[in-house]
Structure formats: structure tokens, C-alpha cells
Curated annotation (Swiss-Prot):
The modification Glycine amide is found at G9. Keywords: Amidation, Disulfide bond, Hormone, Secreted. Belongs to the vasopressin/oxytocin family. Disulfide bonds join C1-C6. GO terms for cellular component: extracellular region. It is found in: Secreted. This is Aspartocin. One of its GO terms (molecular function) is neurohypophyseal hormone activity. It comes from the Eukaryota. The keyword Coiled coil does not apply. The keyword Disulfide bond applies.
Length: 9
């Protein structure tokens, strides 16, 4: 995940 995004769930 990133600071405010979780593309992997």
C-alpha cells in the first residue's frame, strides 16, 4: 500500500 492508496487491497 501507499500513503493513501492500496491497489493490492
Amino acid at each position: 500500500c501507499y500513503i493513501n492508496n492500496c491497489p493490492l487491497g
